[in-house]
Amino acid sequence: AGLLVYPRL
């Protein structure tokens, strides 16, 4: 996605 939710995979 490229959002700031990388730790919320």
Curated annotation (Swiss-Prot):
Cellular component GO terms held in the UniProt record: extracellular region
Top-level taxon of origin: Eukaryota
Modified sites of kind Leucine amide: 9
Keywords: Amidation, Neuropeptide, Secreted
Compartments, as annotated in UniProt: Secreted
Tissue: Dorsal ganglionic sheath of fused ventral nerve cord.
GO BP: any one term: neuropeptide signaling pathway
Main location: secreted
UniProt family annotation: Belongs to the periviscerokinin family.
Role noted for this protein: Mediates visceral muscle contractile activity (myotropic activity).
Protein name as annotated: Periviscerokinin-2
Protein's organism: Sarcophaga bullata
